[in-house]
Amino acid sequence: MAANGLQNAKPNPMVGAVIVHNGRIIGEGYHVRCGQAHAEVNAFASVAKADEHLLSESTIYVSLEPCSHYGKTPPCADLIIAKGVRRVVVGTIDPFAKVKGRGIDKLRDAGIDVTVGVLEKECQWLNRRFFVYNLKHRPYIMLKWCQTENGFLDDGFKPCRLSSPFTTMLVHKLRAETDAI
């Protein structure tokens, strides 16, 4: 679900949230666009009026630690506390310096049971550009080249096309996901 925000969430990370009560999904959302509501806000907004009373008995699953600071939107950790959810499952800690464990601490300080690290590698891979930028203070670098079967860039005799329609499409997809070329 978080991957739905691929084109529009950046420079923010892609985040998904699912609210579950006794094995039934009662709310879900993702971070659609930078500067707009985060995944948790959208998940709570999707809960039917008839199910709102179930929130105190529900678990919210989030792919990235809920934010704990004011930016363009209020802190999601505060919203989770206000909604009365008693259990939060977090995919991975947010590497952004203004969050970096503070959202988890805020939830735990409010008496909420928090589990961290569920599908952690997958959640980090989804936001690898965000993680590299925040942890290594540099852009995520991706290399692309095309070569012949014997390791050359062309056959040396005549112009040739080395890529297939599929790889051309794949390259355009990767370029669309990249901030710079």
Task: Annotate the PLM regions.
Residues 22, 65, 93:
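Cofactor-binding loop segments of dinucleotide-utilizing enzymes, especially the Rossmann-like FAD-
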Residues 33-45, 163-171:
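A short, polar/charged loop-to-alpha-helix boundary motif
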Residues 43-70:
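Mobile, glycine- and charge-enriched loop segments
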Residues 1-8, 25, 51, 56, ...:
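Zinc-dependent deaminase
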Residues 16-18, 62-63, 144-148:
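Short beta-strand segments
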Residues 1-36:
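Flexible, acidic/Gly-rich N-terminal and inter-domain linker regions that tether
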